Amino acid sequence: MTDAVQNEINQEQIAQEENKLIAERRSKLDHIRKNCKANGHPNSFRRDSLAGDLQKKFGEKSKEELEALNHVVSIAGRVMAKRGPFLVIQETSGRIQAYASKEVQQELKDKYQGLDIGDIIGVQGALHKSGKGDLYVNMEQFQLLTKALRPLPEKFHGLTDQEMRYRQRYVDLIVNENSRNAFIVRSKVMSAIRNFMISKQFMEVETPMMHVIPGGASARPFITHHNALDMPMYLRIAPELYLKRLVVGGFDRVFEINRNFRNEGLSPRHNPEFTMMEFYMAYADYKDLMDLTEELLSSVALEVLGSTSMPYGEHTVEFGGKYARMSMFDAIKHYNPNHAQIQALTEEDIQNRDLMVSIAKSVHVDVEPFWTCGQLLEEIFGETAEPKLMQPTFITGYPADISPLARRSDDNPFFTDRFEFFIGGREVANGFSELNDAEDQDARFKAQVEAKESGDDEAMFYDADYITALEHGLPPTAGQGIGIDRLVMLLTNTHTIRDVILFPAMRPQQ
């Protein structure tokens, strides 16, 4: 018998067992509907305590002290285990046990034909402590609030299918503590970032999610249709151009935490729908952004995790202190010490396309015919240097031809005052001194249009209204985007973006 045939037989047996369990639970629900009020789904129980709060308040008290207190609580949650007369009840803050005397057990059997793992129950009773030192509630009153018709995965085969964890995130959250903790951390990260930005006098704003002209990043957009206006529209790939319009309008410090959409591939680092925090500050440059980023990330790590040092894979990442700063050109040289062509490369050579194509191919980059010298430099960097940037590092010196919205460097106009921030071998943030020269921006938009016509699907569109806004005057401004999903991956020691997005994009199940 082949492994494939055996696996098919096993899956069929699992399905049969699951269907049997579901049928038994439906039979119990029929009994409950006939014998209980509210058609078996009451909505009158009110809890007054959470397991986590009870542990903090009473966890250090002795068994005798709790008996003397006779503190009555009402708890509610999902039955996760049955251990003799004890039920393990799980809710948002943690777990607590409930003790069912023989009389209560008989009443549960008569009323509900017994409880199953996954049922949601409300319990009222005095708080006690077991001989092992565990808190529990003595079940004096109880109510089955929701009958679970499907067994939890570990009841029949365990939640081992990674894809099923993403498709049925609700089940994953019930049975997987690591998943729950990751999304608790995510929520805290969002709150910490928001509070930090507000403390720095940034105003939170909301800009359109549907754009007439997609812009603010180099990416392929999703296209939709506005029925009332009878016109195509695009889900936003970035809020940048709208946020900078607000700076033109006089809001000197703005930020937005929201979703972006890019019609591109799926990977451990990419999801078509993702969360970004973008912010813009007038009268600042890209160096100010790097300083602010150091302060922001160390503050968030300390607030959320209680430390600026944390594990990531085999490494320990340090969010505190000053971060390394290195130009893209220098990083390529640093991480390719034995590549003769790269070691001989000068900044002037970067503009020699034939040479850059040769180097790119030598490091296994699949070169597109429409790539510019700047794109070739970035691809060489991405292939040979980026994966090695484990500790927080700002990479500066991005060429202008791949930075259409960034201000040119005063020292060398081939480059821009731009950086990308890397940690854990991946990009987490992108920032630069904004291009506020309307005529230069006009020329760069036109160059992007030419690139799009040459086959670059990710090149930007021409945005005439944004040029008009710049012609009204954008003050010297710096702006940055931070990928929330990738940041949470780092803070939770997670290596795929799907583990930090509650409902990631998936193909329909066959």
Swiss-Prot record:
Q: Which Pfam families would you find in this protein's record?
A: tRNA-synt_2, tRNA_anti-codon
Top EC category: ligase
Q: Does the keyword Protein biosynthesis apply?
A: yes
Give binding positions for Mg(2+) 1. 420, 427
Read off the SUPFAM superfamilies from this record: Class II aaRS and biotin synthetases, Nucleic acid-binding proteins
Q: Binding residues for Mg(2+) 2, per the UniProt record?
A: 427
List the GO cellular component terms. Answer: cytoplasm; cytosol
Alphabetically, the GO molecular function entries are:
ATP binding; lysine-tRNA ligase activity; magnesium ion binding; tRNA binding
Q: Which residues form the signal peptide?
A: none
Q: Where, per UniProt, does this protein localize?
A: Cytoplasm
Going by the UniProt record, its keywords in alphabetical order are:
Aminoacyl-tRNA synthetase, ATP-binding, Cytoplasm, Ligase, Magnesium, Metal-binding, Nucleotide-binding, Protein biosynthesis
One GO BP on record is:
lysyl-tRNA aminoacylation
Q: What is its EC number?
A: 6.1.1.6
Q: Entry cofactor note text?
A: Binds 3 Mg(2+) ions per subunit.
- Read off the CDD domains from this record: LysRS_core (cd00775), LysRS_N (cd04322)
Q: Which cofactor does it need?
A: Mg(2+)
- Predominant cellular place of this UniProt entry's protein: cytoplasm
Q: Which reaction does it catalyse?
A: tRNA(Lys) + L-lysine + ATP = L-lysyl-tRNA(Lys) + AMP + diphosphate
Could you describe the subunit structure of this protein? Homodimer.
Q: Which family does it belong to?
A: Belongs to the class-II aminoacyl-tRNA synthetase family.
The protein's name is Lysine--tRNA ligase
Classification of source organism: Bacteria, Pseudomonadati, Pseudomonadota, Gammaproteobacteria, Vibrionales
